[in-house]
Amino acid sequence: MKKLLMSVTAVAAICGAAYAQRPAPNAAATVQARQASYKQMAGALKGISDQLRSGSPDLAQIRPRAALLADRSVHVLRWFPRGTGPEAGVRTRAKPDIWSNPQGFTHAGATFVVAARELNGAAAAGDIARIRAALPAVQRSCAGCHDTFRGPEH
């Protein structure tokens, strides 16, 4: 797991850092798309959590949500090109630390990728116990990134 995280971090650092330096062609559209994607991921995470809290978790409900998280996780770093932070004049909770601390942001993104892939693997295997075990890592990766790189609601 540690080796996988280091590999994902290295690739994400190269791709994410290069992309983050490119200016956004339309900051408002980029922020809006980013926020819509995060809302979908939050809904997927809540749906999985709700299923696990129910008396009988439904894999047909969990699997597509876990797949969405895994699929979107690899794109997160690309959702923050330079010029889409508070300086863009667009309402966003993205903190300047995303761009001033690219290594930290890249590591947070890579941690999410690894956790989301583990959750998706557990869901694909139909292993409820493994899904239960994997979900907290996804939740921690989200919270860790939010604590550092997301500001309060306006």
Task: Describe the role of every protein-language-model region.
Residues 1-8:
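Bacterial N-terminal signal peptides that target proteins for export
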Residues 11-12:
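Repetitive helical segments and hydrophobic/amphipathic motifs
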Residues 16-20:
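Sec/Tat signal peptide C-region and signal peptidase I cleavage site
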Residues 24, 28-60, 67, 72-154:
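Sequence context surrounding c-type heme c attachment/ligation sites in exported
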